[in-house]
Amino acid sequence: MYLFESLNQLIQTYLPEDQIKRLRQAYLVARDAHEGQTRSSGEPYITHPVAVACILAEMKLDYETLMAALLHDVIEDTPATYQDMEQLFGKSVAELVEGVSKLDKLKFRDKKEAQAENFRKMIMAMVQDIRVILIKLADRTHNMRTLGSLRPDKRRRIARETLEIYSPLAHRLGIHHIKTELEELGFEALYPNRYRVIKEVVKAARGNRKEMIQKILSEIEGRLQEAGIPCRVSGREKHLYSIYCKMVLKEQRFHSIMDIYAFRVIVNDSDTCYRVLGQMHSLYKPRPGRVKDYIAIPKANGYQSLHTSMIGPHGVPVEVQIRTEDMDQMAEMGVAAHWAYKEHGETSTTAQIRAQRWMQSLLELQQSAGSSFEFIESVKSDLFPDEIYVFTPEGRIVELPAGATPVDFAYAVHTDIGHACVGARVDRQPYPLSQPLTSGQTVEIITAPGARPNAAWLNFVVSSKARAKIRQLLKNLKRDDSVSLGRRLLNHALGGSRKLNEIPQENIQRELDRMKLATLDDLLAEIGLGNAMSVVVAKNLQHGDASIPPATQSHGHLPIKGADGVLITFAKCCRPIPGDPIIAHVSPGKGLVIHHESCRNIRGYQKEPEKFMAVEWDKETAQEFITEIKVEMFNHQGALANLTAAINTTTSNIQSLNTEEKDGRVYSAFIRLTARDRVHLANIMRKIRVMPDVIKVTRNRN
């Protein structure tokens, strides 16, 4: 029982004796079930479930969750069954144990498919009982703490998965301390050198800032004491992964991040929060537009606080978060606070209500998604959103991810409104459907009977619900709709000089024979469903009179599906490669010009969908494509030679290389090179990223 002691010390502080007794029983069952099993480190396996239970006990979670944590690997790794668990510990604990089990017994074509399907199962198990994910997050936290005994490649894979899925999931559920620990451990495992460098410079910077921190802390405490406001004031340290992300994603310099002095003020009630805000603004000058009220409008994960940014002593930036004790606990524990042990029942917390709402949307996604991959991508985009808050004409607040458009808003209000949307008014003014919204706007959707979604909407909507619902409807297009759409596309591709009814019947029959189709309607349906390209069919029907010159390729697979006999040009502005989302337009003399969907030169193409067409890469193409990357490096002797040598090892050829000095120590290299597809390019960039002199690698396109 000595291994149980660490857990026992934690639960003695808040659980009654009868529940502690049941936990001891669960420990003994788990210990006996895992008898003889060891972890990669050589320790007895039972140390892992005990550690997971301890993480949850530190959050003061209920005894059923702790019992399930102790037993969470029993069904998967031992002969014990669900029925055994139910008989010994009741249905609730048995369901939790079964929900947490990894369920990897099914056979999949590859590891990626298995991972995507397991993720799908995990999310669905979480929807049934959110305690499943609390146990899973604690399980992942302990696994991250003990990564050292694994192979380096396995460490990196687990760390990347943690940063992409588990840490954002903890954030989405408001469990801040778990999210932070997962980020720090994942960062250290994935980028050990960067972690070490940032840790050292942060340590040095914090030492230099002590005097200023103490001065600001004293001034804040003094002002609030004068105002008779009881409070607790503390400095707020920035975490290493947060600093790294700001340096990489926002291209901020280290010192500009560390020069911000951050503090937290904890008070007794929400009214006092606003009094403290007034005192802060009389002490230091507030920065316009930098006050955020998350008390009146909480974040999606239930987080509540007042944020203000001010100019402090000697002009230094000062950020202050103001919240109550309850809000502080919610900020740290999120939905986990709902299952913290309480002697008396309580109503659901804000975080719990919001989490349930989010999980309901996951159920809808599960029903709409065509595959595990589509589902995992939709959920990942929904895990870590920057939110905006807009209003319906009736004044209801609607929460949307940053970058959301009126179409996202329409689907957030109701699926039927999204499907029937034909226009929008924002703040009573006409507003483009593709233009992003900003917080505080009032949005009104204009609908029309019989209207339906435009496939081009998928190019600008950002919410997972909108994407899933649009895809679902487009997949279910009836044959008549496909024929009608195909007719319009083909007539447009034929140009103004000829229409379909002017094409000789023998030409149509020859094209039907070529495509092995029976009727003209079959051909039009294929075009409408995107299985055949209207410009290619138009060219064949006109005997080469179309504006697309014939292809010069005489052998091998064409890179674009269905473009046989057509000249293809890849736009040099964005240099798309297989795997990129692409769109095409016809250009006289250049044939079919392929652009990346986000290319600036075709921005706004959604307004003229008739001029553009959706195209797909041919999976069997063996062609190499030219793309461009940007590498930021320290200006050390031999760095450039090492860079080119690293690229040569990836079977890529360098077409051109230009450098540009940023400052005395850092320069940027712009490299045009060959890549077979996005996977090949990712391998090249990964090879470069681990070089000691490299700061940052990005793909360079307009």
From Swiss-Prot:
**Keyword Oxidoreductase attributed:** no
The protein's annotated catalytic reaction(s) are: GTP + ATP = guanosine 3'-diphosphate 5'-triphosphate + AMP; guanosine 3',5'-bis(diphosphate) + H2O = GDP + diphosphate + H(+)
Identify the main location.
cytoplasm
Say which domain of life the source belongs to. Bacteria
Q: Name one GO molecular function term.
A: guanosine-3',5'-bis(diphosphate) 3'-diphosphatase activity
Name the protein family.
Belongs to the RelA/SpoT family.
Function statement = In eubacteria ppGpp (guanosine 3'-diphosphate 5'-diphosphate) is a mediator of the stringent response which coordinates a variety of cellular activities in response to changes in nutritional abundance. This enzyme catalyzes both the synthesis and degradation of ppGpp. The second messengers ppGpp and c-di-GMP together control biofilm formation in response to translational stress; ppGpp represses biofilm formation while c-di-GMP induces it. ppGpp activates transcription of CsrA-antagonistic small RNAs CsrB and CsrC, which down-regulate CsrA's action on translation during the stringent response.
The protein's name: Bifunctional (p)ppGpp synthase/hydrolase SpoT
Origin organism of this chain? Escherichia coli (strain K12)
